[in-house]
Amino acid sequence: MPSSLSSCESMRETRGIKHLREERSRRANAMKYVEHSRRVFLETGTRFPREVIWAVGVVKLAAARSNVSLGLLDGGIGSAIQRKAKEVMKGLHDDRFTVDVFQTGSGTGLNMNANELIAELASRDLRGKVHPNDHVNMSQSSNDVGPTAVRVAAAYATERQVVPSLRKIARSLRTLSRRTSATVKPGRTHLRDALPVTMGQEFGAYADAFERDARMLSESVRYLFELPMGGTAVGTGLNADPRFGAMVSREISKETGLRFVPARDRFRATRLLTDVANLSGGFRTVSLDMYRLCQDLRLMFSGPYTGIGEIDIPSQEEVAGSSIMPGKTNPVTVESALLASAEVIGLDAANQFAASLGEFELAMGVPLIGYNAVVQARLLSEALGKLATVVIDRVVPMKERGRMLAETSPALITVISPRIGYDKAAALGKRIAHGAPIRTALRELGYDERQIDSILDMKRLVRPGIPSKRLRGAG
């Protein structure tokens, strides 16, 4: 009896191994391009992000619908392709997109990965042959699919991820600006004491910057709405119905909620990705603004005893700042955003160079630009969102500290400079910088206590005007 059981188990195991081998063989035959590409593309392990795979699925869905509507593709095959394209959009087959980002410059590897995968899945459904080129890639070329998918992915990520995050942090900064509108602190230029400002004015400046950035990106992304679909290999549209490009653009618009249209010049949209490079430059601009905000936050948070110490950020206490110094708190979220800024700026440099690759009819940096643009969008969306909720919304102004620093700043001498002259004021400022109390220095100039109180009235000093006009007698 045991021998018989062992024999049955052995047979089942043998059949299982045979089935696995057949499945591998079937997949290899179905995915010939992908399998062969491993030998000639780079194998860095850098795979396309979810957004790019989703965008390719959108393009294949739109193309199948359009080809069926035009009477070019059998309805049954077209329906199967659409079902599987939707599965690709949902992320059900992300593990099957195995081509490396560092591949042929046109993105043919990405397009053929989608074609072969969808054909294999659709064939299994229909129990018949769906061809990756004849059916899934009908009326298309990698040369219009790649640039289209890159634009769809980058535009969607910008509109649905980055712009909302920009608006979110701008709202948070506006709220913080109002909350700290009466919190006076020293201004600083060249990291040296300058005239006083309010904390609200400083944060309001960044709110305005991010509001402007949101408008700038929304304007830049409009140029990505022109798609080269229907241009096929070189932009002429050979082997595609003249109506195909417009139909695909409409279908992509339905799926994304964005207003994609056929490119005014398909030759331009096929050979140049400078519209995506321009968007990448916009991401760089956002990163620069975010970097400046983070640098200021770090300095204002520095301390608690040997730094500026004008704000506290309690959320940063949620993780230990040091593995050796107990109780140390570091601006960890802020520094995470600084790293994201550096990466986005670096990826933009790669994009500007990649956008110059290619000759004549075709762009040759398609897969890299698509990958980088989506990664840039991810980084910015995450960093801006975290900064808003974890840092900006939880800033605690150290009001007394800020006022004390502002009231002892030698820069306050600027108030009386119009009355006593620049040279005399500069000499007085040096005395104060070397330890002379500002009130004592002002008394020596002949100002009484009422006038000194007026000079040191911080509320007047953070508004436009010439306060010294109101002073009498001294100088």
Predicted segments, located by residue:
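Conserved, well-structured ligand/cofactor-binding cores
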Residues: 2-475
